[in-house]
Amino acid sequence: MRECALTRESKPVAELLRFVVGPDEVIVPDTDAKAEGRGVWVTLGEKAVAEAVKKKAFAKSLKAQVSVPDDLAALARQRLEQRLLNALSMARKAGQIVTGATKVRAAVDADECLALLTATDAARDGRDKMASAIWGHDAAAREAGIEGRVTPHFELLSSDQLGLALGLENVIHAALVKGAAAQSALARAQRLARYIAN
């Protein structure tokens, strides 16, 4: 549990984002919470970080003069995106991600899909088809007596970003399939989605 510098609420670390004083006394995001030095924790959310900048919560929490970039919320989002891209690349190397509508659908039908990733610039009909495949599969699982089954569906990255991470061109649909590297990518996708939503 850590205290949010903005709201002063104690929250689990998973619900917070850490910032540290970097070179030249500038506040920088520490997305993995591993950097040395005293950190400042803020609720995991783009709006919360922007509000913390506006209210000078970093200087108040550190009790010191620090420089805070006006675009700190955007910088934190970029860092979270980069961590997701790195995790997706590792999942690809581990063989724990499939791409293309046909392979993704096969992973869903084989009950191997841990999460679905759709490019933010995908056509509406393609998005809808993949989403309905997931919903249909989850509904069938519930009918079979498997309660609480919800396969996450993320639209966080563009097709160019997905392609770059996976070493492919024009990636519109991808599915994380079961494995440790895929679990890591899923955790990073959930973290980024939470940051964007809040």
Residue spans of the language-model regions?
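N-terminal cysteine/histidine-rich coordination modules
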Residues: 1-56, 60-64
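Signal for well-folded cores of large energy- and translation-related assemblies
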Residues: 8, 81, 89-93, 108-112, ...
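Conserved nucleotide-binding/hydrolysis micro-motifs of P-loop NTPases
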Residues: 11, 47-49, 121-124, 160-161, ...
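Short active-site oxyanion
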Residues: 38-39, 94-95, 113-115, 148-152, ...
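Helical mechanochemical/support elements of P-loop NTPase systems and associated helical scaffolds
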Residues: 39, 54, 80, 100, ...
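Extended interfacial segments that mediate partner engagement and assembly in macromolecular machines
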Residues: 47-124
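Positively charged, polar, low-complexity stretches
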Residues: 101-102, 106, 128-155
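Helix-rich interaction surfaces within compact, conserved domain-sized segments
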Residues: 148, 153-198
